[in-house]
Amino acid sequence: MATADPFDSALDLLRRLNPKHTAEHLNNLITLAPDLTEDLLSSVDQPLTVKRCKQTGRDYLLCDYNRDGDSYRSPWSNQFDPPLEGGNQGGSGGDGEGDGGEGGAAGSIMPGERVRKMEIKANEAFDVYRELYYEGGVSSVYFWNLDDGFAGVVLLKKSSPTNPSSSGVWDSIHVFEASERGRTSNYRLTSTVILSLATKGNALGEVDLSGNMTRQVEQDLPVENDESHIANIGRLVEDMELKMRNLLQEVYFGKAKDVVGDLRSVGSLSEGQRDRDAQMEIIGSMRKA
C-alpha cells in the first residue's frame, strides 16, 4: 500500500475541520510536521490578522505575501516589522529589489520602484473602495515583480462590532498575476472569501456558520499606462466580490436557512403537536363525510 503524502494529508485534514479555527489547526500541524511549514503557510488561506504600522500609525493586514520569516512588510511605510536581519528594510520610495532573506513566498522580495509606485496607488484606491463598500474594516495591497509583469494580493477584512450575543468576520483574499503584452494585459485572479458568523441566545440557542469559498477568473484588458492596471484590478476585484456575495446570500445561506427550517421549529413542540392533532381530526372528519 502506497504511503500517503504528508502535505496532501494535512490539506485533507484541514478541509474537514472547522474553518473558523484554521489558524489554530494550522499551527498544530506545523508543530507536528515542521518540515511542512513553508508549504502549508503558502497554500492554506487563513483568517487575516491586523497589525499597526509603527512608522505611520495605520493598520495593515498580514499574510504570506508580505511575510519574511517572522517579519511583515507594511504597505504604508514599506518597512518590515520586526526589522530584517542585515538591515534590508526597503523604504517608502526606494527600489528595494534585493532579496529579503528566507521566509514568505513572494513577499520575501521587495517590489521594484515602478511596481512599488503602483502598490502605493492601489492601496489608496482600495482604501476608498473599503470605505464605500464595507463602511470600515482594514485593507492592504501588496505587489511584487514577475519576469513578464507583476503580481499582487488585495486583502480586505471587516469584523462586526463586539457583541456578547453575536459576531461576524469577513476576510477576502484576491491574488492576481498580470502578464503584460504590449497594449493589453492578461489578468488571472484567484479570490477566496472566509466568512464566520455566530449568534447565541436563550430563544434560539447557538448558531455557528463558518466556511470559505474560492473562485477564479482570467481576462485580457487594455492597458494605456500603470494607472490602467489599478483600474483593471479594481474592476476585477469588485466584480468578483459582487458575484461571491450573491452566491453566499442566495445559495449558501438560502440553503442553510431551508435546512434549519426543516430540522427546527420556532414554535414549541406542544403547539406543533396540537396543530398536527387538529389537522388529523379534520382529515378524519372529511373521510367520514
UniProtKB/Swiss-Prot annotation:
Q: Name one GO biological process term.
A: filamentous growth
Region listing for Disordered, in residue ranges: 73-110
Q: Which SUPFAM superfamilies match?
A: Subunits of heterodimeric actin filament capping protein Capz (SSF90096)
Record protein name field: F-actin-capping protein subunit beta
**Which segments show compositional bias classed as Gly residues?**
87-106
Gene Ontology molecular function = actin filament binding
The record lists the organism as: Neurospora crassa (strain ATCC 24698 / 74-OR23-1A / CBS 708.71 / DSM 1257 / FGSC 987)
State where the protein is found: Cytoplasm, Cytoskeleton, Actin patch; Cytoplasm, Cytoskeleton
Q: What is its main location?
A: cytoplasm
